[in-house]
Structure formats: structure tokens, C-alpha cells
């Protein structure tokens, strides 16, 4: 587990009703997630964003959930079954160095990395891997927590993303977060 990874037990505090008031997954994701999409939730933990995305993609869509901690994914799978969304959820254990989705290049319509990038060993490698996994024209919502990541650190992360080929499309307002929406340009762009 990464040195700064959110401990398994703390994730229960992150998946609560108060957080839904401050960071409503449906409101945050509505501009980006559509029915029948294949989306990637990196650092999914127990599914605070994964389960709402599974609702949003509908029966023809898929949410691939990645986390470095198997226990998080076990709880996520249980919650997906309870919500009747298990068929739309696929889980994978990552490593500190890799998302680990080999053979899936260019298959994702959208990716989310919500307040987790500061936990990875190499941001450059992570961003390169996400770029590779996205379809041309796909969007990537990247956020970092304002209490753990300074604006200067976030700006450096965005600069790394741009060096990997991402284009910044917007900075939506998301409480308690430093957000950026990045796109993987289409060949005709």
C-alpha cells in the first residue's frame, strides 16, 4: 500500500451521508457519465462514486473499479450486490506502480481519479497509463483534496498530465477539492 493511502477502516468515514451533501456523486458526474459508457474509477475504495456511476451507465454500461487495497474492493462488491448493480461493476486490484489493466488500451469513455493521485508512487506513470486506457475524445476528472495537496502541487500534476498529452478542458467547482477535467484529444483535434 502506498505510504499515504487512505487506510481501509477510514473509508467507512468517507462513504457517509454528510459527504453526499458536500460532494454529491450524481451532480459531480452528470456532465460526464452517460448510459452505455465504459468508465474507470481509479482509487474506487468502497464505491462512493462507483455505485452512482453504475446507476448512470445503466444496464448496457460498465464501471471498472481499481484499488490498491483488496479489502476496499470486497466491500464495494458487497455493496454492489446489495444495490442490484453487481453486473455493472468489475473490480481489479492494482499495484502502487500500475493500474494493471493490460489489453484494455483505448476502451474507456471516462475516467475518475478522485482525491487519490497524491497517493501513487509515480504520477507520470499513472497519468501515462490513464491516457493509454482512454478512448480518443474521452474525459478524465482528476481531483485532489485541498487539505493534502497545495495549489502549487496540483498545478505540477496538471503540468505532468499535459506533458502526457492531456488537454485541460475545465476546472469545475467541487467542494473540498482541486479539480480538473482533462481530455484525450481525438486524432482530428
Language-model regions: role of each:
Residues 19-36:
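Conserved alpha-helix/loop element of class I SAM-dependent methyltransferases that forms part
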Residues 137-144:
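Conserved beta-strand signature within the Rossmann-like core of class I S-adenosyl-L-methionine
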Residues 34-37, 97-110:
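A short acidic, Gly/Pro-enriched loop at the edge of an enzyme's catalytic core
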Residues 124-136:
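A short glycine-rich, Lys/Arg-flanked "PGG" loop and its adjoining helix->strand segment in the class I
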Residues 69:
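Conserved SAM/SAH-binding beta-strand->alpha-helix loop
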Residues 85-97:
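Conserved SAM-binding strand-loop segment of SAM-dependent methyltransferases
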Residues 109-121:
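A short SAM/SAH-binding and catalytic strip from SAM-dependent methyltransferases
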Amino acid at each position: 500500500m502506498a505510504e499515504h493511502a487512505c487506510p481501509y477502516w477510514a473509508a467507512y468515514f468517507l462513504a457517509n451521508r454528510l459527504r453526499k451533501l458536500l460532494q454529491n456523486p450524481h451532480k459531480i458526474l452528470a456532465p460526464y457519465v452517460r448510459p452505455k459508457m465504459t468508465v474507470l474509477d481509479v482509487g474506487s475504495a468502497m464505491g462512493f462514486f462507483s455505485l452512482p456511476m453504475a446507476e448512470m451507465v445503466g444496464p448496457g454500461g460498465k464501471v471498472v473499479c481499481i484499488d490498491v487495497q483488496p479489502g476496499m474492493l470486497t466491500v464495494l462488491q458487497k455493496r454492489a450486490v446489495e444495490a442490484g448493480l453487481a453486473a455493472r461493476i468489475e473490480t481489479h486490484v492494482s499495484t502502487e506502480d500500475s493500474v494493471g489493466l493490460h489489453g484494455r488500451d483505448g476502451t474507456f469513455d471516462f475516467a475518475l481519479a478522485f482525491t487519490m493521485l497524491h497517493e501513487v508512487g509515480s504520477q507520470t506513470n499513472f497519468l501515462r497509463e490513464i491516457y493509454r486506457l482512454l478512448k480518443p475524445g474521452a474525459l478524465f476528472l482528476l481531483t485532489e483534496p485541498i487539505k493534502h495537496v497545495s495549489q502549487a502541487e496540483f498545478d505540477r500534476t496538471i503540468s505532468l498530465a499535459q506533458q502526457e498529452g492531456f488537454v485541460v478542458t475545465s476546472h469545475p467547482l467541487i467542494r473540498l477539492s482541486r479539480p480538473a477535467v482533462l481530455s484525450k484529444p481525438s486524432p482530428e483535434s
